Regions:
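Extended non-catalytic scaffold regions that mediate assembly and binding
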Residues: 65, 111-112, 153
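Short amphipathic alpha-helical surface patches that serve as generic macromolecular interface elements
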Residues: 136, 154-157
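Amphipathic alpha-helical segments that form the core helices of the histone-fold
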Residues: 69-80, 156-168
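Intrinsic disorder/low-complexity detector
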Residues: 2-55, 79-144, 173-210
Length: 210
């Protein structure tokens, strides 16, 4: 197991910055999208949970290690947020791709339950995959900074995709069933509580976000 260290930088303010960075790709567009099977506003957080669970499963992180990874994810998002503010979203994404592409054997593609047929479904898929790609590239930067190899990064990205497929499978029993099960898996893997908000649409899905 790699030494993740015991120190963690303060994250209270940074949590909001991370959420904003992810949500640049998942901005809500009105009532038409409100009750989708998979809420775009939650995609970035779901993929983040998938990523942390993958890291814990593959690299046997303890709680301090998990918190270190989460703090590093937030720090990477700060760089992206700063570049977005200075250069604009397109340039910031281009810079992120350039930094991460050499460490990725292939692009990260978020799995789908079924291919969209309607235009709004295609738009939703595009934006959901954009959110997933953003989180995955933050994750790649974290792994690279911690000294993991390209092969280990590829294995972790596959694990994230597998975790998201499981989330989609759970969602067949209902969207909130999937969210609860994802939160349970996160708690079991990390020992960190992940509350689920009871009122759909009023708040973020996960009461405690990374």
């Amino acid at each position: 197991m790699k030494n993740m260290g015991k120190s963690m930088p303060p994250v209270e303010v940074r949590k909001m910055m991370y959420e904003k960075a992810v949500n640049r790709c998942v901005v809500a567009k009105g009532d038409t999208m409100k009750n989708m099977k998979l809420n775009r506003a939650a995609v970035g957080q779901v993929v983040t949970y998938c990523a942390i669970i993958a890291a814990q499963n593959l690299f046997d992180l303890d709680r301090d290690g998990v918190e270190r990874w989460q703090a590093e994810l937030i720090r990477r998002s700060e760089v992206y947020t700063l570049e977005t503010n200075v250069y604009g979203t397109l340039k910031a994404r281009e810079n992120l791709r350039k930094r991460t592409a050499p460490k990725m054997k292939e692009d990260f593609t978020l799995p789908v339950e079924k291919w969209p047929r309607k235009e709004w479904e295609r738009v939703q898929l595009y934006e959901c995959r954009g959110a997933g790609d953003l989180v995955a590239r933050f994750f790649v930067e974290v792994m690279d900074g911690l000294g993991y190899t390209t092969e280990e990064i590829a294995a972790a990205l596959k694990e994230i995709q597998g975790n998201f497929r499981q989330f989609l499978e759970w969602s067949k029993d209902g969207e909130y069933v999937a969210y609860y099960k994802m939160a349970q898996c996160y708690e079991q893997a990390t020992g960190i509580e992940a509350a689920i908000d009871e009122e759909p649409g009023a708040k973020p899905i996960f009461g405690k976000e990374i």
